[in-house]
Design a protein with these regions (language model features):
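C-terminal cap of metal-dependent C-N hydrolases
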Residues: 130-177
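Flexible loop residues that form catalytic
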Residues: 19-20, 90, 139, 172
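A structural signal for short secondary-structure junctions
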Residues: 10, 30-32, 58-59, 126-130, ...
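Conserved beta-strand positions that form and line the central face of beta-propeller blades
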Residues: 15, 124, 154
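A generic structural signal for nonpolar/aromatic side chains embedded in well-ordered alpha-helices
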Residues: 3, 30, 82, 128, ...
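Generic recognition of short, well-ordered alpha-helical segments
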Residues: 49-52, 77-80, 147
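Active-site core of metal-dependent hydrolases
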Residues: 1-72
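His/Asp/Glu-enriched, well-ordered alpha-helical/loop segment
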Residues: 5-9, 55-142
């Protein structure tokens, strides 16, 4: 392809946004080069440019991530990008019986540890990784106790910056409240 001919597909050092209409040959090339495919669901929806076959790409071994593209999207908030990616994957799965929708866990991975590998050891709370984190507070609903996962799920679908009480980058508190 053109990108490869001009040396733009550096091994494990390239992120390609959108990647909606890739041929099998292009997928093979991008996979062999370790290119990260940045799925910008909100941007694609706003532009009505198409739906990335995310599940199929993942099953074919391509490295995919969830990203925001505020040039055509309307928020950089990653929780909203995760939610919309999952919703669109459900619609895509309805039209393609052989594909299943993304889960919350997969969406979270594709927005954290998955793309974090591009930058090194980030995107996870594992030992040896940079501590990049949001401290999130989600009020319990009246008398209803929820697990941490249920609270995270609520933040992904219903939370916003008012629920973030602290931000850490590489172990340093950068914003409180």
């Amino acid at each position: 392809g053109v990108y490869d001919a001009f040396g733009l597909l550096r091994q494990d050092k390239t992120i390609m946004a959108h990647a909606i209409y890739l041929s099998d040959e292009e997928k093979s090339l991008l996979g062999n080069k370790g290119v990260y495919l940045a799925h910008c669901a909100q941007s694609n929806a706003n532009l009505t440019s198409g739906i990335m076959p995310l599940r199929r790409n993942l099953e074919q071994g391509l490295t995919c991530t969830i990203a925001s593209d505020v040039a055509a999207g309307h928020t950089p908030a990653m929780n909203k990008q995760i939610a919309l990616t999952i919703e669109i994957s459900k619609l895509h799965a309805l039209q393609h019986d052989t594909e299943k929708a993304l889960t919350i866990g997969e969406g979270l991975y594709l927005a954290t540890k998955g793309p974090g590998r591009f930058y090194g050891r980030t995107g996870s709370f594992e030992t040896g990784y940079a501590f990049d984190a949001l401290v999130i507070h989600m009020d319990d609903m009246e008398g209803l106790e929820r697990t941490p996962f249920e609270k995270l799920q609520q933040f992904i679908y219903d939370g916003d910056d008012r629920n973030i009480i602290a931000r850490y980058v590489d172990g340093e508190l950068v914003v409180r409240g």
